[in-house]
Amino acid sequence: MANLKLLLVGIGNPGQKYVHNRHNIGFVILDSLLDSSSVSYQTNSKYSLARTDEDGVTIFYLKPLEFMNLSGKSVAEIAKKNGISPENILIIHDEIDFEFGKLKLKGGGGHAGHNGLRNIVEKLGTNTFFRLRFGVGKPSITSEVPDYVLSNFLPNEKEKIPELVKVSLQKISDWIRERKNGFQKLSDNQ
């Protein structure tokens, strides 16, 4: 039986000054996924990558290390190198169109002005990948969005992040299970 390959991507900006920014919640969630395992990232100048193999499922964990707006290059490279279809990719990212703490798993769709997603769509040549959207809220003045997403979470938000990360991890686990079940059904019918 063939092996199911999945790619989980947390997007954010590299560097210590961005670690606690709203824009980096994708990195936070992806790191939390790996915290409970004995697997660690292998890092080069372009990305950090980890891999697990369990029960016929290979999962790649990717953190592009070029700035968010260039995330698509690493995503496309890892997907192509490992034969991962866009439908088996999950991008974890901040979402300004959602109030803080709202989480939504979505397949396909536009980039809604998110430059990281825009670049991923451009480099993959499709928008059929999945995304876990983590609501970070948004400023009342549109021109303040760049500064807002590069700002740190407020203290009252920061204290809620561990619980929201747990909910995010459950959504990711559910997505993995659905992909695995769908893959097994497809394999059984061949």
Curated annotation (Swiss-Prot):
Positions of the catalytic residues: 23 (proton acceptor)
Chief localisation class: cytoplasm
Cell cycle is among the record's keywords: no
UniProt keyword annotation of Magnesium present: no
Gene Ontology CC annotations of this record: cytoplasm
Keywords: Cytoplasm, Hydrolase, RNA-binding, tRNA-binding
Catalytic activity as recorded in UniProt: an N-acyl-L-alpha-aminoacyl-tRNA + H2O = an N-acyl-L-amino acid + a tRNA + H(+)
Example GO BP: rescue of stalled ribosome
Binding-site residues, tRNA: 18, 67, 69, 115
Record-annotated site: Discriminates between blocked and unblocked aminoacyl-tRNA: 13
Membrane-crossing segments per the record: none
GO molecular function, one term: tRNA binding
EC number(s) recorded for this UniProt protein: 3.1.1.29
UniProt site (Stabilizes the basic form of H active site to accept a proton): 94
Localization, UniProt: Cytoplasm
Enzyme class: hydrolase
Biological role: Hydrolyzes ribosome-free peptidyl-tRNAs (with 1 or more amino acids incorporated), which drop off the ribosome during protein synthesis, or as a result of ribosome stalling.
Subunit structure: Monomer.
Family classification: Belongs to the PTH family.
This protein's name: Peptidyl-tRNA hydrolase
Native organism: Leptospira interrogans serogroup Icterohaemorrhagiae serovar Lai (strain 56601)
UniProt lineage: Bacteria, Pseudomonadati, Spirochaetota, Spirochaetia, Leptospirales
Gene name tied to this protein: pth
